[in-house]
Amino acid sequence: MSNDSVFTLVLLCTNSQYKLNNFKLIMDDVVVIGGGIIGAATAYFLSKEGRKVKVIERDPTYKTASFPLSLGGFRRQFFQKENILLGKFAREFIFQIPDLLKTEKNPNPTASMVTNGYLLMFGPEHAEEQYRALENHKECEAGTKNIKGSELSKIFPYINSEGIETATYTDNQSEGWIDPFMFHSALKSKAIELGAEFIKGEVKSISEIKAKTIVSAAGCWTKELLEDIPVVPQKHTVFRVKCPKYIKEMPLTGD
């Protein structure tokens, strides 16, 4: 089992009719279905390249969206080299948010970045795969350190290392977490300044849209539009607990 996180962007072309809430629109260039973090990022990067982008989002408050519930972690500790390199790109982009996403309305964008690193721990059943992943980390210059389970509590005295075979850690400000809602707001604001248009509406069928390029950024709701695409919801749970002692330097930790 890989520790890689995967998201899917689906690109389609169609010449069919587009209707939204009984209001006909003609889309000349790019339509993005879904205005969450992937949709906003797609709008930003394509608008930056001069594309005419329209984003359709059924809930502009994002009350039921996935991204506001995220821990907002950014990392390069993946198995696949492509994901490692994307993680490195993400880190550099996040560090440049004040410059890249600055707008007239939001001259000081931020995502409240915390660079405490990532600490990922593995039991014996997953250790061998992680050793292989470390080879990819090394090739991609990810800056990942390997820590034996027996040494873990010496570095992190608050961790019970029982059952831990190995762990990987970064302490070079290359990993950490951000506020996903603030990041989304900055991306969306910049995309709009670059010419992207965000429209409230719900797409029931791809055939409703007429555009040169359609991008599905519907996340776990993709299957409602594209039944043949193997994207299914996967439930993750975050528990918030009160620690007896606040540990300011604690990394984002996964077991």
Description of each model-found segment:
Residues A41, F89-E92, I97, L101-K105, ...:
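Flavin-dependent oxidoreductases
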Residues D28, S207-T213:
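Core beta-strand elements of the Rossmann-like FAD/NAD(P) dinucleotide-binding domain
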Residues V30-K54:
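N-terminal Rossmann-like FAD-binding beta1-loop-alpha1 element of flavoenzymes
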Residues Q96, M121-K200:
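Flavin (FAD/FMN) cofactor-binding and adjacent substrate-gating region
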Residues K48-S66:
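Glycine-rich FAD pyrophosphate-binding loop
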Residues G201-I206:
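Conserved SAM/SAH-binding loop
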Residues L71-I155:
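Dinucleotide-binding Rossmann-like beta1-alpha1 core, especially the glycine-rich loop
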Residues I38, T61, W221:
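Conserved Rossmann-like nucleotide-cofactor binding loop
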